[in-house]
């Protein structure tokens, strides 16, 4: 397929960009030193995407409100964000190095500036005695019991001035333009939107005024030709997400409608904005601005970017429109441009999983793209838990400064047992380093546990990743990598024959033994998925034991694809504990019957999933599951609310009395156990005991059951070391 539109040059203002591919603002957090100066890690991270052929890169979040919004800084005035505000020459030196690196590859780079976090900032400052701030009195997103109080007009004007100073600093450092983050419910969105700005007096009771003042201040300081992109939600889509209920529970003001969003963009264009990165949603429905694997491709690009583009054409507005939202398939991105929905496409996660996406597409090597799987564990969850952006399927993302594939000084014979994502990463990396590698896989396809997960419709991103993974590994096989399919290995096959053995043979499912299991039909979740979710014909009601992400994905898919009644039972206080907010909230939203993967109302569940948390299965009888459920268990369905990371103390989160339970009987025809697994480490310990090779390693689930992220990361570390 030809990609004429993708690789056409285009302008934003007077800034000419070599193609229509823009890197979304992902990165930065914890990629700077404690005073906010960009580190080598950040420079190499963006440099790699420039090398890969991206036309325009946009940095991640850079707040300008230090000393005003307490959520953007930490103790002793340190920060996990980079900084460009004020007049520090020390900070500016790092930014100059970054722009020089990007420009070396004929890419452009804009800096993303934001007013701050406001109500979506960490509650920790309040727990240390500081006063949290927002546009009006608003609840903290993480701990709703904590209030944010309104900024004064004077404080807001100070933020406006800081935008101007930060932008001119960026211009001096070589940035080609600025992007303003007025989306997702961050402070700039709070000051310009009805749900959060309910000011009745003063300059900023006008919802558009703050954004207009910021744009004019930047143009005044940097000149009219210095281009500005405004990142905007055409609507917060809260009513679309939850109906009227959320307004009673969380907000006092109504959302921005699409009609108001169009008017807002017109006002911003007249103020001087050159392009709009247009999206929908906010933190309270984070699955829209950060769409997980569960959404189909471009679920709302036509509705949002296409609507704005059509409006601009009608009004004679010359600003460019940038489309965003699951555009990782090259043919989909080209189609969006070809149909005129947008002037540019913005890629975030696709460029984290494969920085060379543009180059591969331009050279007709689409099958070699390392596709994003939409789990968002590396790109988002990592920095929420204190790390920096990285990627599940690309172990070099965020580590470009320190992880290199270097030729081994001594060639070794390497055996790898298991062709899951970890085993494949180990095989690929060791082979590229010059080792003689044999990969043993017991099935006829590579992919491991991900293959079972890809059997359900909402995991089509994983299916695409596995398809390309097998293609890429077969290319290496043609070059000499020995891959042996349908080959189950015993210790006798390995002892004394290899210099290095890497056990990547996964896990064994765990099914708890519960009284009465012989009285009810049951199966383990992974076995059920491998059977293509084949249910006995008489089954109308299914109970899933285990409300982790696998259990909830399976429960939803049973109702969505098989139209059966499903109940989930989970021992912990919440469903999907530890899962990134956007993915968790979307799956809850789907399970509640409030939305669909296609975005179409007709695809919403007819039978929403019933769920019991803080509940334990005590016995089975024929067609019945008996559980003890805590009487004060939480409502399992609050997708607009995230779970506070366990390292942040929440004084309002009270523990339940484990003895305060009621017995509930669930009618069911079939039980599926989604209760995790245990490491398949028998072979590993046998090999160690026999001293089967000089070097023996266990990686991924064969060491500790976990996510694909841990498996691929540990595989890469070992393979670069041997």
Question: Model-predicted segments: where are they?
Answer:
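Glycine-rich FAD pyrophosphate-binding loop
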Residues: 435-451, 565-576
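Rossmann-like NAD(P)H-binding beta-loop-alpha module
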Residues: 419-432, 538-564
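A conserved FAD-binding loop/helix module that cradles the flavin
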Residues: 554, 579-580, 699-722
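Hydrophobic Val/Ile/Leu positions in short beta-strands of Rossmann-like dinucleotide-binding domains
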Residues: 416, 439, 544-545, 568
């Amino acid at each position: 397929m030809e990609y004429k539109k993708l690789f056409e040059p285009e302008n934003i203002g007077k800034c000419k960009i070599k193609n229509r591919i823009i890197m979304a603002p992902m990165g930065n957090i914890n990629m700077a030193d404690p005073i906010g100066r960009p580190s080598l890690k950040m420079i190499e991270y963006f440099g790699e995407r420039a090398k890969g052929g991206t036309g325009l890169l946009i940095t991640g979040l850079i707040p300008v409100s230090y000393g005003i919004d307490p959520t953007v800084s930490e103790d002793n005035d340190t920060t996990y964000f980079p900084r460009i505000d004020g007049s520090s020459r020390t900070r500016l030196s790092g930014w100059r190095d970054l722009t020089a690196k990007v420009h070396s590859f004929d890419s452009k780079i804009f800096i993303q500036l934001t007013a701050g976090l406001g109500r979506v900032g960490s509650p920790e400052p309040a727990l240390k005695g500081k006063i949290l701030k927002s546009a009006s009195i608003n609840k903290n997103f993480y701990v709703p019991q904590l209030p944010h109080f309104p900024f004064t007009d004077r404080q807001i004007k100070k933020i406006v001035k800081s935008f101007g100073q930060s932008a001119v600093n960026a211009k001096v450092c070589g940035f080609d333009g600025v992007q303003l983050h007025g989306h997702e419910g961050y402070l700039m969105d709070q000051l310009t939107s009805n749900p959060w700005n309910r000011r009745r007096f003063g300059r900023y009771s006008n919802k558009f005024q703050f954004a207009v003042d910021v744009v004019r201040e930047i143009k005044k300081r940097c000149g009219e030709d210095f281009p500005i992109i405004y990142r905007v939600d055409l609507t917060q889509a809260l009513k679309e997400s939850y109906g009227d209920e959320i307004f009673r529970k969380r907000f006092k003001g109504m959302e921005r409608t699409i009609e108001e969003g169009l008017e807002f963009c017109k006002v911003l264009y007249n103020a001087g904005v050159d392009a709009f990165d247009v999206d929908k949603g906010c933190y309270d429905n984070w699955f829209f601005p950060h769409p997980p694997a569960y959404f189909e491709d471009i679920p709302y690009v036509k509705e949002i970017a296409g609507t704005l583009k059509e409006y601009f054409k009608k009004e004679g507005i010359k600003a460019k429109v940038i489309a965003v939202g699951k555009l990782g398939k090259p043919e989909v991105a080209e189609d969006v441009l070809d149909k005129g929905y947008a002037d540019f496409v913005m890629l975030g996660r696709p460029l984290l999983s494969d920085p060379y996406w543009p180059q591969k597409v331009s050279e007709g090597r689409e099958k070699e793209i390392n596709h994003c799987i939409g789990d968002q564990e590396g790109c988002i969850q990592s920095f929420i838990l204190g790390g920096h952006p990285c990627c599940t399927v690309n172990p070099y993302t965020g580590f470009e400064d320190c992880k290199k594939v270097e030729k081994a000084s001594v060639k070794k014979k390497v055996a790898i047992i298991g062709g899951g994502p970890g085993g494949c990463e180990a095989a690929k990396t060791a082979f590229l380093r010059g080792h003689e590698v044999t990969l043993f896989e017991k099935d006829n396809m590579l992919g491991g546990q991900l293959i079972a997960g890809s059997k359900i419709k909402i995991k089509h991103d994983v299916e695409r990743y596995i398809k390309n993974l097998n293609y890429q590994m077969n290319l290496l096989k043609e070059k000499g990598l020995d891959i042996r399919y349908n080959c189950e290995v015993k210790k006798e096959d390995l002892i004394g024959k290899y210099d290095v053995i890497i056990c990547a043979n996964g896990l064994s499912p765990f099914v708890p033994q519960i009284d009465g299991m012989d009285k009810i039909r049951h199966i383990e979740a992974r076995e059920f998925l491998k059977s293509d979710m084949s249910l006995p014909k008489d089954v109308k009601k299914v109970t899933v034991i285990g409300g982790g992400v696998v259990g909830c994905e399976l429960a939803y898919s049973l109702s969505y694809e098989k139209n059966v009644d499903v109940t989930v039972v989970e021992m912990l206080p919440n469903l999907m504990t530890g899962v990134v907010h956007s993915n968790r909230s979307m799956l809850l939203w789907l399970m509640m019957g409030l939305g669909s993967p296609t975005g179409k109302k007709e695809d919403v569940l007819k039978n929403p999933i019933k769920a019991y948390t803080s509940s334990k299965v005590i016995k089975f009888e024929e067609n019945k599951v008996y559980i003890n459920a805590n009487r004060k268990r939480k409502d399992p369905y609050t997708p607009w609310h995230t779970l506070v990371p366990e390292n942040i103390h929440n004084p309002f989160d009270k523990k339940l009395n484990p003895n305060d339970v009621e017995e509930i009987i669930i009618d069911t025809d079939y039980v599926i156990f989604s209760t995790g697994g245990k490491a398949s480490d028998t072979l590993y310990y046998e090999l160690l005991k026999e001293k089967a090779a000089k070097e023996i390693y266990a990686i991924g689930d064969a060491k500790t059951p976990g996510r694909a992220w841990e498996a691929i990361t540990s595989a890469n570390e070992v393979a670069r070391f041997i």
